[in-house]
Amino acid sequence: MSVLEQLGALDIGTNEQVDETLQRIADEEAKVNEKLESLLAKQCQIEAKMSGIGRSLSLLHTVDSDSNKLNDQIVNTAQLAESVSAKVRRLDLARCRASECQQRVHDLIDLHLCSQGVVKAIGEEDYEKSATHIARFLAMDQQLLRRTADDVQGSITSVSDAVKTLEDATEKTRVLIAKRFDEAVKADDLASVERFFKIFPLVGCHRTGIEKFSLYICQKLANKAQKELRNAQDIAKAESRLQLAYADRLTAILENFARVVEVNQPIIEAFYGQASSSLIDMVSILQHECDTEVKNLLMEFNKNRQIQYRSKQVNESTQRSAGGGNLGSNSIQALGHYRKPSGGSVDKLNPKEIDAIIAEITVMHARVELYFRFMRRRLQVHVETCVPEKEQFDIMERYEKIMKNSDLRRQMQEILSTYLLLERYFMEESVLKAIGLDTYESGQQCSSMVDDVFFILRKSIRRALTTQSINGTCAVINNVAACLDGDFVNALKAPLKSGYPSGYIDLAQAYNAIQTSLQQGKLHSSDADRGRANFLVQLNNADISTEYIETLCQTMEQEIAGTFPQTTQVERQMLDSCLTELKAVRDALKATVDFGMQQLRSSVIKPRLNPWINQFLNYSHNLNEEELAAYEAGETFVQFFIVQLDGLLNSFKNSLSPRNYDALVSILATEVTIQLERAIKKISFNRLGGLVLDQEVRALGSYLTGATSWSVRDKMTRISQIATLLNLDKITELSEYWNPENNKEMSSWHLTPNEVRTFLTLRNDFRIEDIKRLQL
């Protein structure tokens, strides 16, 4: 809207309206002036830009002209390239046709040469040359030959005749080669066998060649294996390896089959084609024969080593042991057998008789596992270097299937089962024998049983590792855990359950002692001494056994990692589960140690502490200065008490293992604080009596701390706090120890507020009203 239109729309009938309108016009004029000034200020910039645009227009005309020229050149180049490309395609087509024509000519020439040469070679029995001609003929495209004959007038008859000649020659050569190969096999002419084996793929008989050659090798290996098996004992005797005679024969059999694959793999790859399945075909045939030879060997092994008879003995013995396990506590050690009842007479298999057999079985199983790994590695290298990637998985899967379904694998599973049966029997019976023959000399802390038992167990586990079987190793570890948790732990617990013969004995322990004396005969005067020594020795045995198990677990983890470096997650979980079972036995042994220590507590510590602590009641703790001086000048209670404790601990110091001795001191400290607290509650104190008690508690704590490498501070905390309460000068001093702003260690107090008040009432110089007013 213009200014005039705005003026026309305004009402200017009065002076005020005229002034208002004039003001609006002035404001509008000011705005217009500001815009004009802003535009005029940009005049130089606008003129500079317009000048630049003018200069650029001339350059744009030049660019437009050059762009048009470039476009014309590109169009011409594209047309030229399309023309050249068409000519190149026509030239390439012509070259391909010329090459095809040349190939047809060469095929025709080779066809005639081969048809003529093959007849001559067959007549001269030059099978290599005839096979070469046939291989060239088989490599030709038969349909292409016929099209060539149709295209070349007058040649169809000659081409057909040549093809017919070569086809007949191929069949004839195949028959002759097979016949000559069979004759070479009958004549045992290895050179001729290998000669014709290399000719088979040239005439297109890859499968036939592999089968015939593999069967020939199988026959040779079978004859050799039978001869060696008949002379196995003589060979082993000559080599001083009678105990490993059959393991050595098995090793020789497997090495022979593995050597055949290793030696002939390059020949097969060179003559039968790298990408073919000829090698896996040979492995399949050889494996079948290997199964047969190993089966014959194991039959002879089972017969001469009396495996079935010994297994039957083991099973019967196991059943009898299981039946005898229900005899309960009446079972005693007799005839070297822990679980065998007294007077029993059982014809049992001596573990030493099967020790050598077990060792031989482990060697046999390990050799088979090594054979499987070797064959897998040879096939893996073959497929990775020679077989197309898309076929590698199929060939390896076929190999795994062959080995998985082989009779050798099944027989190894059976022999592994036999091994586990015999190994378990050997381990359990050897452990029981070690327990039955347990001896210890005076001054020793442990008996011979611990070292003997763990030597046997380590031997069994390491022997299991040599089988190269994860399942077998896990089974043996589980058997070790069961053996320890059963016979071994029971043997340790038996004397501990009877209690420590110290003269302080409860009714249950007395009953057990009477039962034992009735079973073993009249008690002699030294039976108590032997019982005490045996109790402590078995307690030490249990303690040392926990250390042995920890060492055994650590050693096993290292040896397992070295024996089975590439384990699956499932196999790793199996091994970890077995080790967990073994560690659970360690916990059971710790519980046995705790049980034995509690027996010492009830039989030795508590009965002896009671009269000593009662002496505390004979000393007054309401003292004046003269009585305090007289008390300190004489033998104080704590001096008497420490002498008694020292004598008690010294009687066990050389008999207990360091860890058991520390545990005994810890139990003693606990019992001392409990009984001393009871005694404190029975008497009253004054200020000097509380001071004496505090000194006595400190001296007692210092002695017990110095008597053990373990910390007994926590066990003395409660009694120390009681002594602190009774040693207060004034009842108001308690706030310095109790209030959190004054004592940052308030949470370490082991006394409740009610207990604090109770002990403060023992001070006869503290008023009950003041004690009740305490804010705790």
From Swiss-Prot:
One GO location term (cellular component): Golgi transport complex
Major location category of this protein: Golgi
Biological process annotations from GO: Golgi organization; intra-Golgi vesicle-mediated transport; protein transport; retrograde vesicle-mediated transport, Golgi to endoplasmic reticulum
Gene3D superfamilies: 1.20.58.1970, ESAT-6-like
Modified residues (Phosphoserine): S342, S345
Annotated keywords: Golgi apparatus, Membrane, Phosphoprotein, Protein transport, Transport
Location(s) in or outside the cell: Golgi apparatus membrane
Annotated transmembrane regions: none
InterPro entries in UniProt: COG4 (IPR048682), COG4_C (IPR048684), COG4_M (IPR013167), COG4_N (IPR048680)
Disulphide bridges, residue numbers: none
Record's bilayer topology term: Peripheral membrane protein
Family, per entry: Belongs to the COG4 family.
Summary of the function given for this chain in its UniProt record: Required for normal Golgi function.
Subunit relationships: Component of the conserved oligomeric Golgi complex which is composed of eight different subunits and is required for normal Golgi morphology and localization.
Protein name, entry field: Conserved oligomeric Golgi complex subunit 4
